[in-house]
Structure formats: structure tokens, C-alpha cells
Amino acid sequence: MEFRILYPSALLTQFVKYYWVFERNYLVRTIERGIPIGCMQLVFHRKNRVFSTAINDFQPKAFIEGHMSSYWDLQYEGENETIAITFTPQGVQAFFSTPLYEFYNKNIPVECIGDRLFIDLQQAILNADDKMDCIGIIECYLLEKIKNLKPEIAVSEVIIQQIEYDCNTSIEWLANVSN
């Protein structure tokens, strides 16, 4: 079994909390429990798909996992290789135009998001020779996506960073920055 956490490049740290890579060969069907982490994720299953009790179905090959409100069980069998992007709570909005509440307690297939870039990313990840090469591929795609970042997202990031830095920041200051 291999489980690794990798951190994003400096340009992506305000959007991506970390990447994780999981690989294991399950000789028998195995159930493992998933717990909410408070962040949305973009998940890729490069080998066998995983059955999730959260959606009572097999997870798609590539999907957005919204905020989950409770634990769920995952059934693994055979060779599994999962690569995921865990977004920062505020960073996810830079990549998806869909309102975030629409992802709540759901696993939305990449094809349903309506963004060609993520469909291309899915194909690149599934076709990559090595799981560690996938992180570099992901970084390139995400950097391409933030080139067209909406100004209001950049402003909200500044506001969140200021609140995290100094919780006594005045409402007036925050309002002035946001306008």
C-alpha cells in the first residue's frame, strides 16, 4: 500500500491544499470508511472504480467530491490507484463556475461540469504512464485555468488571508477592499 501527500507549487497554494496519491492491490473485497475533511476534492480513479455508500453506486473515474456531511463506506477490490486534488475552502471557486452548494453531498462526474479543460485533464491523467507524473499534469492544467481568474475571486482571497492573519480586521476595511 502506498499513500502520499504532495504539496502544490507556490502559485497554487492559495487554491490547492494538497494532492494525495493512494495505491493498493486488494486481494479480497475490502470496506474502508471515509470521513468528511471539510474541503472539496477532484478525484481520479486510474484503475478499478470504488463503490461508495454515499452515492450507493460506483464512483465515476473522475469526479468532484463536494462537502460531505457524514461518513461513508468505500468498497475496494483488485488494483486501485487514486489521485486527488484537495482544494482550499476558498480556492475551489477559482476552478468551477457551478455554485458550490450544488456539490454538497455529491460526487459529480467531470463530464457533467461542462468545462472542457477538466475533461481533457481526466484523459491526460487516465492515460499517463506513471501516477507521480499525474501531479505535474494536474499542476499544468490548474495553472492554465487560473490564467483567466475572475478579479472578484482574487479579491476574496485577499480578504480571507487578511482575516486569517488578523481576526480583528475591521469590517470597514474588508468592505473597502471588496469594492
Task: For each feature predicted by the language model, list its residue ranges.
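Alpha-helical bundle regulatory/interaction domains
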Residues: 1-172, 176-178
